[in-house]
């Protein structure tokens, strides 16, 4: 059973060691984010030359190595893109497929080796260029990283938005066999959601990514979706009985650290998966 959690986007000093880890699940931390933008006061696109934009002081190479040494069920991934940087939207903005892929392979290989990472997650949410360009760039990138033995798993993080889905479904159609998990952002839906409605959305996304391991999700910030206190775990139990619960992911450790429920729901999710 797989549990995954995004970490590091909010620079509030959250550390890997703050997060409770159940030894009986596969546990993935996902660093948020690496972005192909310049790191400076006004970030601009770099055509595939990625830089770390997560809290590298608290989530450093030595801290990655330490948490993986402590728990042999922990792997660490990095998410590409994200919604915004410095208050501006992050765009997927390649000059050409081949130049973007070459730059991305070399810059990400460096980051992945430096930080002892195991996988990548694709979380672009705004796009310049058409779905086919996105499919080729990302598809070729993940194919090469896997073939070179740089990463052992890949996930994508779409949500229910027409433009987003058209890009990720184009990628899925051509390169779905290279993608191990679909981190579907169910928390982007409205928060006025019943368990039945959630299960309906889940089936809808399973059919959008046929054959994919669609993971369910909740957020610990104030965004939407089905919250733990409103029946999220009831929905999970139903999916588990049906053999459809491939895993759970959470946005985000940063928010949980600051919430009144400090990591309570992370523990609940992991014990449900481990049971």
From Swiss-Prot:
Chemical reaction(s) catalysed: Random endo-hydrolysis of N-acetyl-beta-D-glucosaminide (1->4)-beta-linkages in chitin and chitodextrins
What molecular functions are annotated in GO for this chain? chitin binding; endochitinase activity
Domain GH18: start-end pairs: 1-270
Q: Does the keyword Hydrolase apply?
A: yes
Catalytic residues (UniProt) = 125 (proton donor)
- Hydrolase: is it a keyword of this entry? yes
For this UniProt record, give its keywords in alphabetical order, as a comma-separated list: Carbohydrate metabolism, Chitin degradation, Chitin-binding, Glycosidase, Hydrolase, Polysaccharide degradation
Q: Per its UniProt entry, which superkingdom is the organism in?
A: Eukaryota
One of its GO biological process terms is:
chitin catabolic process
What this protein is called in its record is: Chitinase 2
Q: Which organism is it from?
A: Tulipa saxatilis subsp. bakeri (Tulip)
